[in-house]
From Swiss-Prot:
Protein name in UniProt: Chaperonin GroEL
Disulfide cross-links: none
Gene3D superfamilies named among the record's database cross-references: GroEL (3.50.7.10), GroEL-like equatorial domain (1.10.560.10), TCP-1-like chaperonin intermediate domain (3.30.260.10)
Domain of life: Bacteria
Alphabetical list of SUPFAM superfamilies matching this protein: GroEL apical domain-like, GroEL equatorial domain-like, GroEL-intermediate domain like
PROSITE patterns (UniProt xref): CHAPERONINS_CPN60
Subcellular location: Cytoplasm
Main location: cytoplasm
Recorded catalytic activity of this chain's protein: ATP + H2O + a folded polypeptide = ADP + phosphate + an unfolded polypeptide
InterPro entries: Chaperonin_Cpn60_CS, Cpn60/GroEL, Cpn60/GroEL/TCP-1, GroEL-like_apical_dom_sf, GROEL-like_equatorial_sf, TCP-1-like_intermed_sf
GO molecular function terms listed in the Swiss-Prot or TrEMBL record: ATP binding; ATP-dependent protein folding chaperone; isomerase activity; unfolded protein binding
């Protein structure tokens, strides 16, 4: 296919146009007084949202080069969302400011590579400044503040998330679900969740929700593959006689064994679901042992001389309830002795202290959370489906932001932290176009506060100057329209969100500044041949050719 190649100023101007179209659609949502965006859907009702990444994901532009610019900025918001779960609008605004300011300088003759180096150096010191001022959070009120801000100043959502963290701890599992009523509620269930689902969809008990739910089941824990039915048959017969459901957790269930379980489940002879064991290698063995201790069962392991065909009901674990979906298994209220569980928890804590590997520490902390924490479920209720979707998205944002705040702490919100980071950038001593690159970041750092105040109906430049004149955490609260200590007022952002937004914006911004050529597919010409055929009607006169005979 033929390509269209654009160079220099023409290429950059079109990229900039695409960047601005996307960013202008996204930035109206920023701040407590940001506006909604209504997105048309081909099927069903339109989506109403104040979430930057949701808006960005919907945008596709007709012009190929403009669309490339838009897609690159879309990458900023999705990447920030993936890393920190929030801050997508801030990231987009920062990227737009860096690109607009940078391209002015490139057009004026600045060296794009030197600008990039200056931008990179400025971002490093700004990020260090953000980290330096981060405050660790531990209290329920602090969790509530972070979640409330991220949920567009909805204290109901903020308080629910704070309660969830308070109940299951920092490492606990918190999930978001749609409620059957208009009330938004929080349910706490003691239990363990791991990321493995059923091996066959024929095992579900609720075909509509595609989940298998068993009350008071036996749990068979086996560390090898189950392929032959003769190994499994003795246990299945004992379970069938007891008339109780069975959950099988094994390395793999396949072949004859899987076929027999599925057929008997469909015939309602037995209630059974098979799940692949979580983890790999030694970590899998350790996690199976965790499950065994939690449920009061034993890992049937050939390494210890046990055979599956000799397994007894006494070796099986028990739980009040087990819920299995396509991707996750949740064991609720395992029947294990609390002293055994506590002993296992202490053992894992000791391993966390002793390990030198960050990866191992992270995995051990995950195991600890699964064993010690519960499972919190936030049921989101609303009057209409449109409101439900919008509210659920806000709850998920707030949950991600709170997790980010737990990781790296909080900083003053309202764009103040980025503005305060200007001092560190000003202290940089650079020369030539590198200094110009640092100045681009200086200008970009004040853009979020400008936009927040602009969306609140005030002049951004005035608020920026007034904020500079004040010290510490004193900033402008766009919700109450007063100047106050933003930390005390609960106007806070997770440091991780602010940091990620700046880093991702600078990364894509610098890429666009150093772009010299764009190559796109040449649009195919509209097929005109079909339209011209109508004129052939005149060929009817060919009837007169009969006289030639």
């Amino acid at each position: 296919m033929a390509k269209t190649i654009e160079f220099d100023e023409t290429a950059r101007r079109k990229l900039l146009s695409g960047v601005n179209k996307l960013a202008n659609a996204v930035k109206v949502t920023l701040g407590p007084k940001g506006r909604n965006v209504v997105i048309d859907k081909k099927f069903g009702s339109p989506t109403i949202t104040k979430d930057g990444v949701t808006v960005a994901k919907e945008i596709e532009l007709e012009d190929a080069i403009e669309n490339m610019g838009a897609q690159m900025v879309k990458e900023v918001s999705t990447k920030t969302n993936d890393i920190a779960g929030d801050g997508t609008t801030t990231a987009t605004i920062l990227a737009q400011a860096i690109i607009n300011e940078g391209l002015k300088n490139v057009t004026a003759g600045a060296n794009p590579m030197a600008l990039k180096h200056g931008i990179d150096k400025a971002v490093v010191v700004a990020v260090e400044e953000i980290k330096k001022h981060a405050i660790k959070i531990n209290s329920k009120a602090e969790y509530a503040n972070v979640a409330t801000i991220s949920a567009n100043n909805d204290p109901e959502i903020g308080n629910l998330i704070a309660q969830a963290f308070d109940k299951v701890g920092k490492e606990g599992v918190i999930t978001v679900d749609e409620a059957k009523s208009i009330e938004t509620t929080l349910d706490i269930v003691e239990g363990m969740q791991f990321d493995r689902g059923y091996v066959s969809p024929y095992m579900v008990t609720d075909p509509e929700a595609m989940i298998a739910t068993f009350n008071d089941p036996f749990i068979l824990i086996y560390d090898k593959k189950i392929a032959s039915m003769k190994d499994l048959l003795p246990v299945l017969e004992k379970i069938a006689q007891a008339g109780r459901p069975l959950v099988i957790i094994a390395e793999e269930v396949e072949g004859e064994a899987l076929a027999t379980i599925v057929v008997n489940t469909l015939r309602k002879t037995i209630q059974c679901v098979a799940v692949k064991a979580p983890g790999f290698g030694d970590r899998r063995k350790a996690m199976l042992e965790d499950i065994a201790i939690l449920t009061g069962g034993q890992v049937i392991s050939e390494d210890l001389g046990m055979k599956l065909e000799n397994a007894d009901v006494k070796m099986l674990g028990r739980a009040k309830k087990v819920v299995v979906d396509k991707e996750n298994t949740t064991i609720i209220e395992g029947a294990g002795a609390s002293k055994d569980i506590q002993g296992r928890v202490n053992q894992i804590k000791k391993q966390i202290e002793d390990t030198t590997s960050d990866y191992d520490r992270e995995k051990l902390q995950e195991r600890l959370a699964k064993l010690a924490g519960g499972v919190a479920v936030i049921h989101v209720g609303a009057a209409t489906e449109v409101e439900m979707k919008e509210k659920k998205a806000r709850v998920e944002d707030a949950l991600s932001a709170t997790r980010a705040a737990v990781e790296e702490g909080i900083v003053p919100g309202g764009g103040l932290t980025l503005l305060r980071a200007q001092d560190a950038v000003k202290a940089l001593k650079l020369v030539g176009d590198e200094q110009t690159g640092a100045n681009i970041i200086l200008r970009a750092l004040e853009e979020p506060i400008r936009m927040i105040t602009s969306n609140a109906g005030l002049e951004g430049s005035v608020i920026v100057e007034q904020a500079r004149a004040r010290k510490g955490n004193e900033g402008f609260n766009a919700l109450t329209m007063v100047w106050e200590d933003l930390i005390k007022a609960g106007v806070v952002d997770p440091a991780k969100v602010v940091r990620s937004a700046l880093q991702n914006a600078a990364s894509i911004g610098a890429m666009i500044l150093t772009t010299e050529v764009t190559i796109t597919d040449k649009p195919e010409p509209k097929d005109a041949s079909g339209a011209g055929m109508g004129g052939m009607g005149g060929m009817g006169g060919m009837g007169g050719m009969g006289g030639m005979m």
